[in-house]
Amino acid sequence: MKYQVTFFDKETKYKPVACIIEAESRTEIAKGKWKDAMKKVCIKRGWKPSEMVKMGYTTWKCRRAE
């Protein structure tokens, strides 16, 4: 199943970034697949994961992608 994982700043929800990943369930994403999504976003944007965290992208949410 495909899921959209969105990362955003918890306080302001400013400029969210998202990607679509394959996973069996949301539980699988919560257990660590979100890290793969974060790497995918970083590669797409040319960031390092540590830079992404410093910019404030510390919260993520997941929803089913159609």
Where are the regions a protein language model picked out?
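N-terminal acidic leader/helix
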Residues: 2-28, 59
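Short, mixed-charge low-complexity intrinsically disordered segments
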Residues: 35-66
